[in-house]
């Protein structure tokens, strides 16, 4: 059963409003609270589970609907409560604004559950939690894992060519060397108490280059525990591209489950012996796979083609300068 986080918080007696100490811990959120509440939807017993709730965050161009036919049913089968947060404009707008939705989601889900929140994000969805953790320090004590599937932690060289005639704000910000990513990755990339798993594929045609653990997705600095895992390092002949890594891939899912069920980030050495034979993750119905992938591709293509272009990267917020 799905319900808004606002309803869940009322049921468990939690409050969305931060304490005065929390209000001072990071910049005030500019997005109206009603919009933040409306973007957050949960499934399962978030308030009563013995497990950390999972926050699913989709990538640029996509919405939480992308999880309905993969991670949603898979996590339900595992008995894991989860929530989704819809980033504004399918994640195409200013990522600094999208980060406020993530901050609110972390605070609200943690308050509703009384537990840490484990984040699983694809592409931008695997990177934007790091902006939340960097600039809203109170969120760090509320997060257990950040699991990025083909995350755009250091951007992509592909965006530079795409943005020459102008492009969506989020594309500008995910260019390698953008002001946004320079700010994000200045200083420590990770934080103590948070475990970071970054799953990448050498066949990633969107977040590139990703040929090894010094590629676009990987992290190396800070006090968080980090695991950068190449799918082809686990399974040398494995075929997975950018979209499938975050939506259907069986090996990526096995790494997600390993991170969620152990202390610390994912460890490929713990994967089942038959992990490389699992082409599709649980929850994906092979009968409807082609239809669901076609729908996803249509959403991506429509957003890329029709979302309004801007001539330059959005200015950094004052708190990030």
Task: Enumerate the predicted regions with their spans.
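Hydrophobic/aromatic beta-strand patches that form the interior of the parallel beta-sheet core
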Residues: 55, 83, 147, 197-199, ...
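Active-site catalytic motif of lipid deacylating hydrolases and related acyltransferases
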Residues: 25-31, 39-116, 290-294, 299-318
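Serine-dependent carboxylesterase/thioesterase catalytic core
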Residues: 58, 85, 96-190, 206
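Short, surface-exposed basic-aromatic patches at helix termini and helix-loop junctions that form
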Residues: 75-76, 134-139, 217
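Secretory targeting and sorting signals
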Residues: 1-23
């Amino acid at each position: 059963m799905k319900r808004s986080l606002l309803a869940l918080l009322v049921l468990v007696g939690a409050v969305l409003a931060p304490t005065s100490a929390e209000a001072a811990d990071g910049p005030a959120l500019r997005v109206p609270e009603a919009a933040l509440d409306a973007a957050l939807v949960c499934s399962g017993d978030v308030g009563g589970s013995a497990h950390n709730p999972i926050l699913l965050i989709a990538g640029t161009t996509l919405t939480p609907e992308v999880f309905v036919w993969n991670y949603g049913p898979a996590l339900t089968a595992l008995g894991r409560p989860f929530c989704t947060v819809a980033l504004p404009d399918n994640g195409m707008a200013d990522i600094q604004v999208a980060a406020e939705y993530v901050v609110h989601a972390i605070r609200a889900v943690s308050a509703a559950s009384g537990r840490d929140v484990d984040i699983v994000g694809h592409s931008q969805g695997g990177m934007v939690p790091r902006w939340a953790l960097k600039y809203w320090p109170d969120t760090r004590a509320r997060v257990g894992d950040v699991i990025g599937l083909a995350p755009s932690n250091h951007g992509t060289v592909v965006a530079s060519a795409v943005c020459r005639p102008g492009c969506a704000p989020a594309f500008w910000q995910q260019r390698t060397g953008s002001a946004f990513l320079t700010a994000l990755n200045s200083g420590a990339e990770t934080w103590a108490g948070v475990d970071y798993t970054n799953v990448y594929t050498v066949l990633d045609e969107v977040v590139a280059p990703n040929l090894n653990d010094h590629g676009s997705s990987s992290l190396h600095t800070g006090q968080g525990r980090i695991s950068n895992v190449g799918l082809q390092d686990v399974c040398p002949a494995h075929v997975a591209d950018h979209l499938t890594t975050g939506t259907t891939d069986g090996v990526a899912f096995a790494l997600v489950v390993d991170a969620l069920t152990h202390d610390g980030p994912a460890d490929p050495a713990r994967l089942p012996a038959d992990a490389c034979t699992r082409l599709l993750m649980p929850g994906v119905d092979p009968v409807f796979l082609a239809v669901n992938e076609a729908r996803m591709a249509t959403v991506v293509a429509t957003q890329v083609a029709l979302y309004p272009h801007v001539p330059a990267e959005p200015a950094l917020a004052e708190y990030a300068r």
